Each structure stands twice: as structure tokens, then as C-alpha cells.
Amino acid sequence: MFHRVLPTRDEMRPLETTAEEFEWQMRILSRHFNVLRLVDAVDMLRTASLPPRAACVTFDDGYADNAAIAQPIMAKYGIPATVFVASGHLDGGRMWNDTIVESLRIIGEGELDLGEFGLGVFPIGDTGTRVKCAYSIIRASKYLGDARRREIAEYVASKAGELPDNLMLTSARLRDLSAAGVDIGGHTVSHPILAGLPIEQAREEIQGGRAALAGILGQPPRIFAYPNGRRDQDYNDEHVQLVKDAGFEAAVVTNVGVAGEGTDLYQLPRFTPWDKSELRYMVRMAWNARRLVKHTIA
């Protein structure tokens, strides 16, 4: 599971994969794994016909660099992928956590006082303090509810200058990705924590995102990714049923694991390849390939 692929290392986003890292990851996958379209892997899971060392590549949220940087590399190695898109952030939108990170990138040195939100005062100096501040705010805000998160993000942004409006895909680029063979999946409208919403609002998020993507692409997405994606903390059985009711054929989560015979197709586990060296990555992938019935979704 990926989110972004950056052209070079960004100190404000230390965990994101760079183009160089992504290239060797895709090279290793292409040489040693049977990399499948996720929709095909789901069909094969349903019929117990997955090949050995099967793997799938997925991206969450719908960042512009998925098309600009990741897709050409995947095309080079013949790697299929699925990009799960939160439809409300297309065409110049920005996720609340990105608003915080990009604001902390440019806020002047001094202190950021978030006492009125119960978050305290943060020193702002070198890049290290900015990264610590950004991710402390994100962690503390994630489960406060959508309105409160937006309020905090907007307040932080008010202390910064102009923020980028090109982080996410446009509708046109989304169509280009689809035309290039990349599958597009549903990821709600606004990327909320579903477990924190009234059930009808959760239904609207799931169905609305699917309808919006269908309007852009001419066909509805077949697979869904739960925002944040952790069982019980971010979604529960009610949301699984909503995903089924919306017409999705399967769904992925962020609980770490590999999928095999008997895995719930509406709760397919994934993992993120954080490894920064080829050797560690190969060891991790080899270990995952031996688990269960030797199938993995990244």
C-alpha cells in the first residue's frame, strides 16, 4: 500500500517513497512475483485459483504523483495497480493532514499556539521541529471528528502563506490513469473516519464517492478502501455492509497481513513497504510470500 511517490526525498514527509526507491521495488516485484490487477486477484481468491507469489499494488487517496511519477515506472515494468480515490479532493482539493504538513513547511519560526484546541504550544524552528509539530497535530486531531479536524487545519493554515493546490489528481488525469490501465477504486468523498459518522452519513460518503467516480470515468469502481482502514477503530461490520450495499465487489483495509483462501473479500489486508534498502525489501517480500497461501497485497 502506497500513498505518494515523490521525485526526491522530502524532509517534511520522511516516510514517503521516492521515485528511486519505487523503481527498485517495482523491478523486484516484476522479477520475483506474479503481480496482478487487484480485481483479478479478488476473482481468483473467490475461486481459489491464485498463482503462487501473487501480489497487488495499491495507492490510497488519489495523489497527483501517482500519475506523474508512479505510473510511468509501473508501465516500464508491466506492473498493474489500483488507485483508491477520495472524490471530494480531486481538482484542486487538499486533505486536512496535507494542509497541516504544508502549512508547517512555511510557517515562520517561533511558536504555534493551539491551546484553544487543547493541543498545546509547539516550537517552530528547524525542519525537525516542523515535522514533529505537524505529525503531533495530525495524530492528536485524527479522531476528533471531521468538523474539528477541519477547524484545526484551517487555523494552522491561517498562520502560513499560500498552500499548494496541485497535490491531488484532477479529473482529467484520473481519466488518463484509467485509460492507461490503472484501476480506480472508491475511497469515499471526503476521507472521513467512518466509525465516527452517523450511519446514514457514512452511507452517503461511500455511495457518493462511488457515484462521483462513475460520473468521471463512465463506470463505477469495483473495489473500495476504508479510509484509515483499521478494523473497529476506523470501520466496523456496519460499514462492511454499507460497502456491499453500494455495489462494491471487495474492499481493502490497512490491517497488516496477506490474503489467502478464506480471507473476507471485504476486509483484505495490506502492508506498506517502508524498507529503504533493496535487501530489507526483498527479505520482507520473501517472508510475506511464505505466509498463508503465498499471496500478498502491497
Give short role names for the model-derived ranges:
Residues 90, 190-192:
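Short, catalytically relevant binding-site loops at active-site mouths
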Residues 50-51, 63, 68-84, 138-162, ...:
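CE4/NodB-like, metal-dependent polysaccharide N-deacetylase domain
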Residues 57-105:
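Gly/lys/ser-thr-rich phosphate-binding loops in alpha/beta enzymes
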Residues 91-183:
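Extended, charge-rich helix/loop segments that form flexible
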Residues 1-58, 65, 96-105, 109-114, ...:
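C-terminal active-site subregion of NodB/CE4 polysaccharide deacetylases
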Residues 78-91, 125-139, 232-238, 261-276, ...:
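Short secondary-structure transition/capping segments
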Residues 25, 70, 170-173, 239:
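Residues within well-ordered alpha-helices
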